[in-house]
Structure formats: C-alpha cells, structure tokens
Amino acid sequence: MKVVLITGMSGSGKDTLAELLALYLDDKNLNVWIQHNADPVKYMANVYFDVDNYKTNEGKKIMMGITDLMYSIDAYYFEKLNMKKVPKDTDVLIIPDWRYLNTRYYFEGKEENEVYTVMVQRTNARDYSVEVKRKEERLLSNLEPLIVINNDGTIIDLEHTAENLANYVALDLTAKKV
C-alpha cells in the first residue's frame, strides 16, 4: 500500500490537497482512502472535555494534550486504531493531518508500504495563540517531509500540484519539490 502523509500548519490546505489528490488517484483506478489521525482525538475531546470546536486555541490545546497522553501509553495508538477502518483493498492511504514521527515510523516499519511525506506551506494560514503555534511548529520541524508544496496560489494551482503529486505517487518517480 502507498501511504501519503500530509502535514502543515492549521489552515494550510492539507485537507483540500488530500481531496484533490484522491480524485486524481481515483482517476488512475486506484482505491484511495482518506483517514484522519485526529478523528479519534476529536471524539475523545468531545466526549471527555465537551469540545465542539477544534479550531480554537483551547480546542487545539486539549487535542494536543490527548494525543501526547495516548502516544505516551502506546507510540502507535492512533495508527493502530485508524488502520482498523482502512479497507483491505486500499491502494493509497492518505493521512492529511500528519503531526508526529510515530506515524511515519509506523508505516515505514511495514515492508508492504511505500511512504510519501508531504508538507503544505501557506503564508496566511490560520492564526492561533503563540503557545499553540509554537507547539505546532516544533512538531512539524521534526518531520522532514520529502515533498514541500507552497500553497499561496489559487485553487487551480493546488489542483495542478495535486495532479503532479498523483502522477508521482502512481509512477513512483523520485522528486524533491512539486
């Protein structure tokens, strides 16, 4: 299975890129599945902390705290949990909210996987408190993605980038910049 891990600051366009990438890969007759690592975290935040809005400073802090706690118990907690949802016939798994090296290690540790790491950058991404931004920046600085995408253009530009990325994933080409 090919695994595309997409990271970037909040509001950088990760989900949009994932959706566009899935469309282009689907056009190549590949079975694509998008799975967010944060889905179980959002569920826990809602059930245990009554968090409905994850895009606030408080929501972000709670979600980061839950993630840190669960990863301290099991380094691959969310990866194992989420893989139960991925259909067996999946050719390409897209995770558009990659934040931790654990995720990369989990998928790279399985011989049958080919892992592609992507960072989406955007100048005017969503603005959070200094504390939340610093934690996000610290997490992202450790990831060392293979591909870096600048998303300061139009949606048409991002579509072209997604198409190029789909070709890269489908053809197993080697590149550093899309």
Predicted regions, residues:
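ATP-dependent small-molecule kinase phosphotransfer cores
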Residues: 30-92, 99
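Small-molecule kinase domains that catalyze NTP-dependent phosphoryl transfer to phosphate-bearing small molecules
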Residues: 82, 116, 120-178
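Hydrophobic anchor at the beta1->P-loop junction of P-loop NTPases
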Residues: 6, 95
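Active-site signature of alpha/beta-hydrolase-fold catalytic machinery across serine-
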Residues: 20
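Extreme N-terminal starter segment of soluble prokaryotic enzymes
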Residues: 1-4, 115
